[in-house]
């Protein structure tokens, strides 16, 4: 009997007020008629870090190996995981221009959590009316707003 993996759709986004500045990330997970929203942030961060955190944190909540369609508006995340990561590792975490890769610890964390799942990466144009991308963006901005109001991230 074949082992069927749970199929999960994930929509992620990151936002930053100032770059660097207060940032937030949001994610929507959808499977078998269920849905879960996640969001949080960091006080001093960048938009790229928040884009990475959205994918990492969304994948970390999956309790078993899944077949994932992950949608992001971040070319940085999609190209990093799909095109650049293997070359960075072979070059001791250096870019083709010999600079140290930014956010190494997050790239390593993303690679680790990706190894548990079968993931298809999809790029969607940000701020172009895609409903689930807009919702993920709203969650990321909600994290920033809550931090500014309360002085902490609630999620």
Curated annotation (Swiss-Prot):
One of its GO terms (biological process) is DNA replication, removal of RNA primer. It catalyses: Endonucleolytic cleavage to 5'-phosphomonoester. Gene3D superfamilies: Ribonuclease H-like superfamily/Ribonuclease H. Its EC number is 3.1.26.4. Binds 1 Mg(2+) ion per subunit. May bind a second metal ion at a regulatory site, or after substrate binding. Keywords: Cytoplasm, Endonuclease, Hydrolase, Magnesium, Metal-binding, Nuclease. PROSITE patterns: RNASE_H_1. Mg(2+) 2 binds at residues 13, 137. Residues 4-145 form the RNase H type-1 domain. Pfam families: RNase_H. InterPro entries: RNase_H, RNaseH-like_sf, RNaseH_domain, RNaseH_sf, RNaseHI. One of its GO terms (cellular component) is cytoplasm. It is found in: Cytoplasm. Its cofactor is Mg(2+). One of its GO terms (molecular function) is nucleic acid binding. The keyword Isomerase does not apply. Mg(2+) 1 binds at residues 13, 51, 73. Endonuclease that specifically degrades the RNA of RNA-DNA hybrids. Monomer. Belongs to the RNase H family. This is Ribonuclease H. It comes from Bartonella quintana (strain Toulouse). The lineage of its organism: Bacteria, Pseudomonadati, Pseudomonadota, Alphaproteobacteria, Hyphomicrobiales. The gene is rnhA.
């Amino acid at each position: 009997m074949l082992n069927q993996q749970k199929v999960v759709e994930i929509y992620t986004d990151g936002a930053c007020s100032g770059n660097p500045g207060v940032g937030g990330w949001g994610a929507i997970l959808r499977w078998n008629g269920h849905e879960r929203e996640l969001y949080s942030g960091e006080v001093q961060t960048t938009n790229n870090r928040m884009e990475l955190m959205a994918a990492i944190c969304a994948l970390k909540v999956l309790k078993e190996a899944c077949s994932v369609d992950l949608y992001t508006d971040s070319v940085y995340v999609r190209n990093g995981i799909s095109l650049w990561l293997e070359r960075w590792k072979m070059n001791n975490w250096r870019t083709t221009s010999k600079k140290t890769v930014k956010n190494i610890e997050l790239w390593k964390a993303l690679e680790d959590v990706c190894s548990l799942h079968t993931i298809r990466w999809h790029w969607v144009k940000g701020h172009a009316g895609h409903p689930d991308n807009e919702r993920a963006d709203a969650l990321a901005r909600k994290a920033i707003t809550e931090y500014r109001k309360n002085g902490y991230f609630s999620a």
